[in-house]
């Protein structure tokens, strides 16, 4: 959507992680990191952000995929740390990062386009105690939930043109019932 960016890799090392993030904060208004934000032995992003003085706005959202997402600020800079699993990271990018990017360059329609569509035949959605973003395909005015919803499976996104949002603890949703659909950017 017309924004430039730089990709940089960092090893599982706290000092190197901190230096890379510090440099990114000097050069950019919005910094997006992927991986290293959970609670594993080699997840140093949260520690580095804390040491750099990034103020946490939120961390860990009750959703699937993408629970270990972080958003914070440092002065006038915005920092996102997205999960390391590819599909979880992409889902969070669509739902959280894109609105901030769009807002930063003055767009009024910052969120993904939202529709209410019936669930396709043969589909039903089970409730979870946390919100869900399900990769989906809109076909003939209905939305079909795709197989392969694992947060590590990026290939399903290649087939999807939407995400279905399901609130935490929602009732069972059966075929034909209306669901909230977020159109993915094309």
Walk through the language-model features, giving the residues of each:
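Phosphate-binding glycine-rich loops and their immediate beta-loop-alpha structural context
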Residues: 1-33
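Active-site-adjacent beta-strand anchor residues
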Residues: 7-10, 35, 82-83, 166
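Short catalytic-site patches enriched in acidic/histidine residues
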Residues: 11-21, 39-60
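Glycine-/small-residue-rich active-site loops that bind phosphorylated ligands and cofactors
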Residues: 12-13, 37-40, 88-89, 171
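Glycine-rich beta-strand-to-loop/alpha-helix junction loops that act as flexible
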Residues: 31-45, 83
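Flexible glycine/proline-rich
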Residues: 48-186
């Amino acid at each position: 959507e017309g924004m430039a960016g730089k990709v940089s890799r960092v090893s599982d090392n706290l000092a190197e992680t901190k230096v890379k993030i510090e440099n990114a904060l000097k050069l950019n208004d919005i910094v997006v990191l992927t991986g290293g934000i959970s609670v594993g032995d080699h997840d140093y992003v949260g520690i580095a952000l804390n040491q750099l003085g990034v103020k946490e706005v939120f961390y860990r959202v009750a959703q699937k995929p993408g629970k270990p997402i972080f958003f914070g600020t440092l002065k006038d800079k915005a920092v996102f740390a997205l999960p390391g699993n590819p599909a979880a990271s992409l889902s969070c990018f669509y739902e959280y990062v894109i609105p901030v990017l769009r807002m930063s360059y003055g767009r009024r329609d910052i969120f993904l386009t939202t529709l209410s569509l019936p669930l396709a035949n043969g589909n039903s959605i089970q409730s979870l105690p946390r919100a869900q973003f399900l990769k989906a395909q809109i076909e003939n005015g209905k939305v079909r939930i795709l197989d392969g919803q694992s947060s590590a499976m990026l290939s399903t996104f290649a087939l999807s043109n939407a995400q279905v949002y399901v609130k935490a603890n929602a009732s069972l949703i059966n075929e034909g019932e209306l669901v909230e659909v977020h159109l993915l950017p094309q």
